[in-house]
């Protein structure tokens, strides 16, 4: 051991020497053949811990700080600690803390401000005593200020006690001195790697390099850009990105070591202790310029001086106050910048000089500083080992984290037979959010040091692998312990406000734990976890949303699937029956799960769909709840102003309506919602008409009205007649049920007449003779023609017709691209829509975007124009201002494609589409429609072609003499299944009025076949109003085939049979 600095009280442990100051490093004979584990320096005393766990002290003992009454000039053993294996010590001005290998803390010395934590009334304690209030807590680090103390536990809890004159306890401005350890609750949840204390200021350092400081700040020693004391922990933002791995404090200054080996200093600089070649104070962290060419691996602070070790040269550098020789430079001069400590330093990787005895060279193991003294533990070159590196943490001094080594250790014990300390270790780890937040860090490229509002610093794949390795059927005791810790200790302690982004990580990782997906744990773990998540304050929730938004899709889907499973589980319980006494808690649970999904859905939408929207669909909803009833309840809640946008706790008394969370509905469920909404509106319109009619009996000025919207049309003038009626129709009348009458036909419209009306009028309106729409040969689709002589009234009519079709649950045949439905739902068409409408043009645009070279102008020869046909002639349109003069290049090609798409789908047809849009929404607007995705709305308007002919046969009903196994029915289905697809579709058109099936699928298409009189010479007859087929009792298969084909080939017109 080498010692230098103030020896006036014997604090260097050199024995009875004459000098009061030692100007350069001097060997201590006492430590020959002894290995030092730790050194603590007080203002006038020093404590040494040897490798065997024994403690020695020397120096001033006026306040009992040595823990014994022996000699003060040379180190003497503290016999009271003889039975303890001490691993670390820390010293205040005149008090000492010692930590043993069991995590227990012993204290002695001055206790004027409660800095010993013993809750006693004595001014001084001369013999070490155990701090009993910490005896049940496993402490891994201790630190001392002059009159206060800090401790870090294995569970990442920070405790403080002693003086709080300057706020150095971090407990708030109202807090007086504390005589027993107090938990700093404001830091809960953060994963810490170090605690440090200066004269009257304190620091904690997180695993990802964030620093929180509090206490005295007269000289800027907290690095917060001012000189105001802090009474609660404050984040030192300027160092967050610097990968800080170690921090130490002097009386009024601070030094921080980076992962790359740089040193930042700040605070009091009056003696040059900051190393910036000045005596100025620094209120912001500043890098020590003269050390920037070297990699520093150790840094230590004395009262007003700083030491740094550079392993490449083996040298120790010091700067600051030198009046007591503490710089080791051979003089008492102060140094304002790093200066080499005198000595024959030997680099661990170097070669020992041959001409000098190796005993004259020192190979530094570790440096220590404190008060006005400095020490260096060294070895001779022949015994030289690697020096300590403060950038690498000692696992024994760190908090619990879930890692490969720890899991292997736990799994190494046979199931059901691991010792109590292992159970305590598992419990401690999974009871602490701080420990979980320090687990699964992204260590590749030191990524976790970039933790912030946009990056979590977590390796999610590591989290998944380690959780699955830990939770195994072969080790049920581990799973049970983890589940119990999460349920009883971790989750109940979660709060809505969090001190830092690092305290949020477990919200990201815990869903990867298989225990969360176990339905047995839904109500005890998953739902309480969701409640804590939903109740987070706006700022931390926003950060969590940011982190979710950059997850890999499968990881994001995992969280979505988890809470979908929770919802289904709860709804199944609800269907079985919930006792009235449990309804309130059930409501709360269901609201929680749905609110979590709502947050995740919001994130998904903001990111442009991290996962497909249909991944949020809960297909079981239709089976588990009455959607119609749910919708009616939701409408009533809206009418009475019930707000479900706030937290879960207030929602327990409000019945859950799934309609509040419409993103879980699949297309079929949404269709049911829309139909329910339409039925409600129709009923309201009918009721209003009835009320008006009743009033008209007593008040002649009030006209009677029809409760239905009646369209009387002629087949030969179907468009003109419909326009005439609809033009005069009031908006409110569109909400009435639609009844269609064809002039000269006897059919009563029970649905079939209406079906054919829509079929015929759309065929007429879309006919090229009107020139309203352009047909695209490549895609066989139509789009609005930008050159039409028709006024906007016709487009308005088509919009109304489409709206009426949806409103009256009728499929219509529209050959529009998906872009139409996007625009109806206020979504922007994209290049994909151009590819659908104009495949060749779309491919060309994609080739332009994908072209890898820079010579786009020469290769494509494009400018911001589009060439359109105008009655046989071509016309060039500019896509942007001065488009003809703007060449398409690598930088603006995306803008060109966007402008092209915008022209085709928006600008060129704006007035026409606006008329269509207005007509459509006049009938079919509202909140429910906006729940649909564009492809779902398309399927609802035109139906789909997901044919399942066996399902059709299965759902068919029979009347009269027929049943499923009747000979005629058997040959009917044989014939039907042998028909080609086109004939089958014709049969659907013949029987139902449309060759497409409803969005709800074949199961919703109920056909009825009934027997009729007459002979086999009669044709089958359809009643499209009722999807009813009159089928004569054919006995021959071939006869049935011929008659059926003959019937379906002539299917237009209605008459009563």
Swiss-Prot record:
Active site residues per record: 1025
GO cellular component: cytosol; fibrillar center
Sequence ranges assigned to domain HECT in this UniProt record: 730-1057
Any one Pfam family match given in the protein's UniProt record, by short name: WD40_RLD
Keywords for the protein's UniProt record, in alphabetical order: Cytoplasm, Differentiation, Repeat, Spermatogenesis, Transferase, Ubl conjugation pathway
RCC1 repeat ranges, renumbered to this chain: 1-51, 52-101, 102-154, 156-207, 208-259, 261-311, 313-366
InterPro entries linked to this entry: HECT_dom (IPR000569), Hect_E3_ubiquitin_ligase (IPR035983), RCC1/BLIP-II (IPR009091), Reg_chr_condens (IPR000408), Ub-ligase/GTPase-reg (IPR051709)
Expression sites by tissue: Ubiquitously expressed, highest expression is found in testis during spermiogenesis. It is specifically found in spermatogonia, spermatocytes, and spermatids with little or no expression detectable in the spermatozoa, or interstitial cells.
Transferase keyword on record: yes
Listed GO biological process terms: cell differentiation; negative regulation of smoothened signaling pathway; protein ubiquitination; spermatogenesis
Knockout-associated phenotype: Disruption causes defects in spermatozoon maturation and impaired fertility in males; females display normal fertility. Males produce litter sizes some 50% smaller, as well 50% of mature spermatozoa have reduced mobility.
Catalytic activity: S-ubiquitinyl-[E2 ubiquitin-conjugating enzyme]-L-cysteine + [acceptor protein]-L-lysine = [E2 ubiquitin-conjugating enzyme]-L-cysteine + N(6)-ubiquitinyl-[acceptor protein]-L-lysine
Pathway membership: Protein modification; protein ubiquitination
GO molecular function, one term: ubiquitin protein ligase activity
UniProt-listed Enzyme Commission number(s): 2.3.2.26
Compartments reported by the entry: Cytoplasm, Cytosol
UniProt keyword annotation of Hydrolase present: no
Further comment: T.wilfordii induces abnormal expression of spermiogenesis genes including Herc4, the spermatogenic cells in the convoluted seminiferous tubules decrease and the lumen is obstructed by large deciduous spermatogenic cells. T.wilfordii has apparent antifertility effects.
Functional description taken from the UniProt entry: Probable E3 ubiquitin-protein ligase involved in either protein trafficking or in the distribution of cellular structures. Required for spermatozoon maturation and fertility, and for the removal of the cytoplasmic droplet of the spermatozoon. E3 ubiquitin-protein ligases accept ubiquitin from an E2 ubiquitin-conjugating enzyme in the form of a thioester and then directly transfer it to targeted substrates.
Protein name per its UniProtKB record: Probable E3 ubiquitin-protein ligase HERC4
Gene name, Swiss-Prot/TrEMBL: Herc4
């Amino acid at each position: 051991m080498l010692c230098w600095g103030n020896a006036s009280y014997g604090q260097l442990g050199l024995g009875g020497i004459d000098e009061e100051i030692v100007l350069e490093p001097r060997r201590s004979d006492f430590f020959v053949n002894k290995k030092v584990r730790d050194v603590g320096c007080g203002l006038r005393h020093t404590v040494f811990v040897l490798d065997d766990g024994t403690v020695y002290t020397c120096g001033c003992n006026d306040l009992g700080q040595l823990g014994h009454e022996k000699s003060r000039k040379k180190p003497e053993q503290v016999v009271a600690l003889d039975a303890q294996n001490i691993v670390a010590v820390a010293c205040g001005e005149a008090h000492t803390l010692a930590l043993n290998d069991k995590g227990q803390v012993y204290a002695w010395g001055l206790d004027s401000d409660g800095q010993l934590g013993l809750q006693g009334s004595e001014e001084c304690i001369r013999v070490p005593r155990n701090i009993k209030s910490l005896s049940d807590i496993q402490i891994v680090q201790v630190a001392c200020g002059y009159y206060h103390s800090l401790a870090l536990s294995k569970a990442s809890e920070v405790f403080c006690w002693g003086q709080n004159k300057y706020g150095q306890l971090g407990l708030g401005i109202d807090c007086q001195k504390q005589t027993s350890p107090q938990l700093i609750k404001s830091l809960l949840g953060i994963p810490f790697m170090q605690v440090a204390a200066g004269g009257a200021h304190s620091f904690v350092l997180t695993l990802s390099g964030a620093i929180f400081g509090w206490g005295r700040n007269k000289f800027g020693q907290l690095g917060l850009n001012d000189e105001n004391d802090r009474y609660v922990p404050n984040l030192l933002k300027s160092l967050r990105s610097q990968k800080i791995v170690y921090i130490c404090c002097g009386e009024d200054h601070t030094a921080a070591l980076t992962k790359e080996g740089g040193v930042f200093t700040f605070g009091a600089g009056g003696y040059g202790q900051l190393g910036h070649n000045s005596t100025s104070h620094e209120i912001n962290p500043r890098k020590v310029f003269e050390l920037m060419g070297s990699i520093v691996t150790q840094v230590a602070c004395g009262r007003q001086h700083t030491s740094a070790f550079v392993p490449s040269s083996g040298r120790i550098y010091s700067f600051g106050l030198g009046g007591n020789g503490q710089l080791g430079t051979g003089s008492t001069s102060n140094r304002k910048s790093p200066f080499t400590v005198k000595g024959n330093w030997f680099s661990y990787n170097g070669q020992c000089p041959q001409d000098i005895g190796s005993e004259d060279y020192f190979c530094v193991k570790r440096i220590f500083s404190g008060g006005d003294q400095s020490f260096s533990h060294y070895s001779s070159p022949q015994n030289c080992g690697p020096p300590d590196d403060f950038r690498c943490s000692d696992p024994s001094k760190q908090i619990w984290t879930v890692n490969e080594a720890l899991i292997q250790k736990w799994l190494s014990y046979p199931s059901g037979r691991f010792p109590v300390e292992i159970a305590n270790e598992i419990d401690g780890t999974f009871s602490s959010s701080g420990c979980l937040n320090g687990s699964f860090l992204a260590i590749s490229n030191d990524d976790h040091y970039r933790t912030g509002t946009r990056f979590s610093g977590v390796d999610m794949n590591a989290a998944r692998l380690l959780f699955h390795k830990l939770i195994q059927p072969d080790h049920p005791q581990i799973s049970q312990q983890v589940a119990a810790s999460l349920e009883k200790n971790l989750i109940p302690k979660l709060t809505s406000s969090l001190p830092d982004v690092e305290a949020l990580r477990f919200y990201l990782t815990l869903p990867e734990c298989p225990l969360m997906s176990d339905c047995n744990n839904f109500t005890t773990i998953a739902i309480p976890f969701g409640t804590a998540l939903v109740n987070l304050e706006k700022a931390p929730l926003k950060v969590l949303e940011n982190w979710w938004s950059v997850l890999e899709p499968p990881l994001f889907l995992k969280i979505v699937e988890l809470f979908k499973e929770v919802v289904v589980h709860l709804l199944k319980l609800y269907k079985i029956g919930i006792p009235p006494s449990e309804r309130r808690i059930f409501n709360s649970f269901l609201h929680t799960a749905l609110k979590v999904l709502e947050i995740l859905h919001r994130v998904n939408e903001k990111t442009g769909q991290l996962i497909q929207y249909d991944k949020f669909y809960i297909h079981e909803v239709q089976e588990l709840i009455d959607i119609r009833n749910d919708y009616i309840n939701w409408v009533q809640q809206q009418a009475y102003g019930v707000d479900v946008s706030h937290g879960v706790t207030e929602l327990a008394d409000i019945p859950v309506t799934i309609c509040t969370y419409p993103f879980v509905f699949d297309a079929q469920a949404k269709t049911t919602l829309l139909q329910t909404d339409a039925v409600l509106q129709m009923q309201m319109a009918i009721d209003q008409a009835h009320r008006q009619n009743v009033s008209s009996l007593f008040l002649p000025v009030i006209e009677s009205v029809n409760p239905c919207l009646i369209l009387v049309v002629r087949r030969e003038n179907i468009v003109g007649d419909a326009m005439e009626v609809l033009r005069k129709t009031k908006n409110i009348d569109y909400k009435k049920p639609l009844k269609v009458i064809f002039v000269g036909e006897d059919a009563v419209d029970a649905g079939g007449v209406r079906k054919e009306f829509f079929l015929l009028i759309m065929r007429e309106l879309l006919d090229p003779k009107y020139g309203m729409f352009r047909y695209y040969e490549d895609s066989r689709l139509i789009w609005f023609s930008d050159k039409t002589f028709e006024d906007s009234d016709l487009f308005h009519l088509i919009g109304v017709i489409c709206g009426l079709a949806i409103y009256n649950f009728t499929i219509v045949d529209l050959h529009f691209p998906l872009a139409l439905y996007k625009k109806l739902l206020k979504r922007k068409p994209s290049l994909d829509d151009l590819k659908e409408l104009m495949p060749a043009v779309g491919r060309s645009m994609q080739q332009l975007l994908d072209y890898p070279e820079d010579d786009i102008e020469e290769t494509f020869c494009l400018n911001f124009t589009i060439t359109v046909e105008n009655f046989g002639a071509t016309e060039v349109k500019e896509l942007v201002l001065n488009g003809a003069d703007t060449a398409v290049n690598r930088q603006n090609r995306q803008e060109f494609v966007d402008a092209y798409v915008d022209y085709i789908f928006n600008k060129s047809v704006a007035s026409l589409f606006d008329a269509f849009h207005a007509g459509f929404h006049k009938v079919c607007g509202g909140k429910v429609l906006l729940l649909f995705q564009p492809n779902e709305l398309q399927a609802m308007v035109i139906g789909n072609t997901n044919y399942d002919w066996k399902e059709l046969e299965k759902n068919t009903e029979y009347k009269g003499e027929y049943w499923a196994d009747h000979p005629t029915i058997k040959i009917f289905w044989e014939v039907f299944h042998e028909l080609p697809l086109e004939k089958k579709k014709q049969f659907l058109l013949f029987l139902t009025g449309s060759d497409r099936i409803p969005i709800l699928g074949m199961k919703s298409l109920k056909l009825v076949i009934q027997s009729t009189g007459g002979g086999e010479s009669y044709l089958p007859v359809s009643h499209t109003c009722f999807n009813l087929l009159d089928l004569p009792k054919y006995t021959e298969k071939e006869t049935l085939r011929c008659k059926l084909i003959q019937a379906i080939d002539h299917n237009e017109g209605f008459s009563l049979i």
